[in-house]
Amino acid sequence: MDKPNTGAAHTQFVRRTAYRVLAGINDVAIVTPSAATALALLTHPRRGIRRDELLGRVGFILEMAGRKQAPLSNTLKNALKIRRQEVAVAMAEMDEAGTRHLSLSMGAGSPLARARGKAVVEVIDEVLSRFIQKKQIRRHRFEDDVVYTPVPDARINLDIYKNNIVHLFVKEAILAAAIRGNLEQGFADLDRVREEASFLSDILKYEFVYNPKLSFEEQFQRTMAIFIESGLLEARLDEDGRTQISVPVAAHETMLVCHRVLEPWLEGYWMLITTVDAHLSVPTTEKDLVKRVQRITERRYQEGDLTCAEAGSSVPLKNCVSYLVETKLLQRQGSRRDQTLSLGERSADDPAQLTELAQRLRRYFCV
């Protein structure tokens, strides 16, 4: 019997094939009311979100889904069809004002996002009622408004819904994080942003599926062009001829929301790397390491150091371990049954490698 092909070329072929399959799955993943609502709730930068803002955020998510040609569930399609006149009026209003191309930068506050949100209000209300019944969110009634807040212990349940459509925002989230993490006096150097977007794409490659037909540079250039055309970014040359980019005031909220998409992974990876750096003095099993990180993550969340309880989800933590093994910051030892983790050759020779990686990742936390 022939031995299985385990060479580097075969590994690359299998990885590319897997990416194509997963990309195809993402292309047909249906945007459901539950997924859109959970994404709107969990990417909101504050503790709770007002009802009208939530609906606008859902409308913005539906616009992004439309731009990506993502299929909508029948309930969403029917709701938008029934209220298509109101959506058409909002489009006409933005066309007349010459702001249609700025709908992304306007985010949840654009007339189009608000119209779409109102169009699906009954569907979203059903989802909110179900989340409340399951004790996943709380509703706070006030004289003139309603505020919804995710229940901390239930964020991980909402995260499952959210992750069904998070792929629609990944490239925007990575670019937004790379930009916001490198702004100095309101500007970021384009070459620096490109370098850091590449870093974020690489460290999170076990989490997300990137377009296998495009190189990183091609995807970066396309996303940059969309950001500039839609008013999310402005670009200018400095006195040395280097391109500097900035975020217009009107686009700050949308950029923050895009950035927030990555926050659970950023916090989770940071927690695992810092735990390895501080505590992995003797070999340990992956299971024990992940459990330890989860306990520390829960404590740090309760202390207010972290904003996402879902950062302690086991799957991303295990993916982070895989990344550290691949980059020789960790190594696996022993048989599969009795396998342990210990410092890899890079971190054993230079312990500062882990500290520097954690610090580099930490700068991309949302602030």
Stretches found by the model and what they are:
Residues M1-V367:
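Membrane-interfacial terminal anchoring regions of lipid-handling membrane enzymes
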